[in-house]
Amino acid sequence: MTPVVALVGRPNVGKSTLFNRLTRSRDALVADFPGLTRDRKYGQAVVDDMNFIVVDTGGIDGSEEGIEVKMAEQSLQAIDESDVVLFMVDARAGVTSADIGIANHLRRQKKKVFLVANKTDGLDGDVHCADFYSLALGEVYQIAASHGRGVTSLLEKALAPFFEELTGKSAEEEAADEDAAYWAAFEGTDVTEEDESDEELTGEDRYADLPIKFAIIGRPNVGKSTLTNRMLGEDRVIVYDLPGTTRDSIYIPLERDDQHYIVIDTAGVRKKKKIYETVEKFSVVKTLQAIEDANVVLLLIDAREGVSDQDLSLLGFTLHSGRSIVIAVNKWDGLDQDTKEKIKEDLERRLGFVDFARVHFISALHGSGVGNLFDSIQEAYRSATKRISTSMLTRIMNMAAEDHQPPLVRGRRVKLKYAHAGGYNPPRIIIHGNQVKDLPESYKRYLINYYRKSLKIMGTPIHIEFQEGDNPFEGRRNKLTQTQIRKRRRMMSFVKKG
């Protein structure tokens, strides 16, 4: 499960600065859900290839209503959802009454808390941070979020237990394995017999026997539970809302037409009598973790309410995660033709940035159109895991360049040399050439659409990266021949005479 890191502290200690640095975004609003998480921002971050979700809580100032009230209103839920809490303080301001109140609350929580002193740039950190040990939260980690100093080492230590749980090895053991694999490859030997067996499974065979994991996501009360029950079969009356943490998604195996699936249910499958509840608890963290863990994301939209900002936020997070997408518009039955046309126009206008995703109009309650969702889920998964040879990718690239030449850059034509696969799920294509990094965004979109049409890729984003062609002679001096040496001597003699 993707770990969750919460940033907690009073106002102006640098939480948003650290959040923006971790999410590599200036506005950092990767997922902002009005009315549900009004005072919390959710983002996606990566440190040393370790993915995690970071939550920026509202500043807690105990001067007005009391520290406990503010904590309950803004940050208590974020702390409950998190695996790690980074309690941020201002090294320049020293210990405040608000810091003491927050520390008292955090000590009562069964969470791993790291005390982080920010704004230590230009200061004697040890002197200015000494007072923070009085908060009794252990070691004080010194960082400068605005410059990034100390951030990586802090996150590496905070996420180390989750890294070990994920790989079964410590970071040191993982690094040793990487070194062994590198030298084994360099010497032309294999590290383990298992590696040989893995190499035999190439292409789509590697994924053929694996179940397709798809997550059903959407705003509260759009029909996620109804759709899940419809897919599983109405006679299946099982309570999947097990006791325990509220942010754990439920993984339900499903088989249809000899294809195995795993449904990641973020709402919980409930008994029939509870399906029609008017209020459904919506956990942002649970939804974001389900997106991270899925192969395909099925976004459910309420036809009667249209596309909301929350839907767009969920789509944005899904695209950022590189997941395949299928869109289902629920509650389509009972609408008149004029209303349906208006809804379709609105969908086309607001969802233009995901025009590669299949859109289905369904009724989860009555089952109409639900069966077609499986075809699109399979199509999206196969598109995302499709193996394409270098020769095919290069040939399509050349065809695209012939149909529409790359533009001139500083008076010179951009030259595309060759293309190869850089990864899958989602497909990543690396194009090599001269001045390719100067290509305008319009031509990049043209290449993506050309590849999508040529390879019949639907339901998954395509990422194209450009690499400049290296000059093999750059930095090297040509070795002169004897004739060239004699010619240079003659020229030098004429210069001296002159």
From Swiss-Prot:
At the top level of its lineage, which domain of life is listed? Bacteria
Q: Which residues bind GTP 1 per the record?
A: 9-16, 56-60, 118-121
**Keywords of this entry:** GTP-binding, Nucleotide-binding, Repeat, Ribosome biogenesis
Q: Which InterPro entries match?
A: G_ENGA, GTP-bd, GTPase_Der, KH_dom-like, KH_dom-like_a/b, P-loop_NTPase, Small_GTP-bd
A single GO BP? ribosome biogenesis
Extract the GO molecular function terms from the UniProt entry: GTP binding; ribosome binding
- In this chain, GTP 2 is annotated as bound at 218-225, 265-269, 330-333
Cross-referenced Pfam families:
KH_dom-like, MMR_HSR1
Q: How does this protein assemble?
A: Associates with the 50S ribosomal subunit.
Alphabetical list of NCBIfam families matching this protein: GTPase_EngA, small_GTP
Family under the similarity heading? Belongs to the TRAFAC class TrmE-Era-EngA-EngB-Septin-like GTPase superfamily. EngA (Der) GTPase family.
Q: What does this protein do?
A: GTPase that plays an essential role in the late steps of ribosome biogenesis.
HAMAP family membership: GTPase_Der
Which protein are we looking at? GTPase Der
Which organism does this record belong to?
Answer: Tolumonas auensis (strain DSM 9187 / NBRC 110442 / TA 4)
